[in-house]
Amino acid sequence: VSKSPRIAIVGAGLGGAATAALLLKEGLNVRVYEQASGFSRLGAGIHVGPNVMKILRRIGVEDALNAQGSHPDYWYSRHWETGDIMAQIPLGDYAVKNYGASYLTVHRGDFHALLIDALPKSAVAYGKSLTKVEDRGDVVVMHFADGTSEEADIVIGADGVNSRIREELLGPELPKYAGYLAHRAVFPTPPVKNGMLPFDSCVKWWSDDRHMMVYFVTGKADELYYV
């Protein structure tokens, strides 16, 4: 009987945690190595479409995310000056009926927490910042900044924009400025006052050379994300 390969995932973000959860569901031998010292509620808003929700159904966190997120009926596009609706994409019940799962917006950190909680605590090693990876043919050796090393048969890189795995495979590549800037923040939803227009659950404001997206990131609609 062949032994199950040792699978290492570098990075316990959304991609790494989801990959680990799916592989563990298949009974595979998986361990995740994360450079952060522990979990924290990082990030801002994120859209989660029906295709992703179907994957989360397999992991077992679909219902929890549905309860946690905001479910906009439409994604509106509005003119920056007049507020006129330029376009609207049906979501809400339309998405469930036509695509078989919800479309929602949520705080990335809350989404991430559900994925981390779906993993056994023993499956994630924190404080493991990868410095080097060696493919020795029969085994892959990972070296970490704390002086330790680990072996695996398969290594999956899920270590984000500054990926050491990608750099080891493809060489270093400096970022290039593309000429665009983005500002983002999460705010408590302000109280509604007389004369204020109601908040759209999900809206994109358009001008000629810039745009701003605004949407709720909780089912309670108590936090708004601007980008």
Predicted segments — roles?
Residues 78, 198-227:
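Active-site substrate-recognition segment that forms the wall
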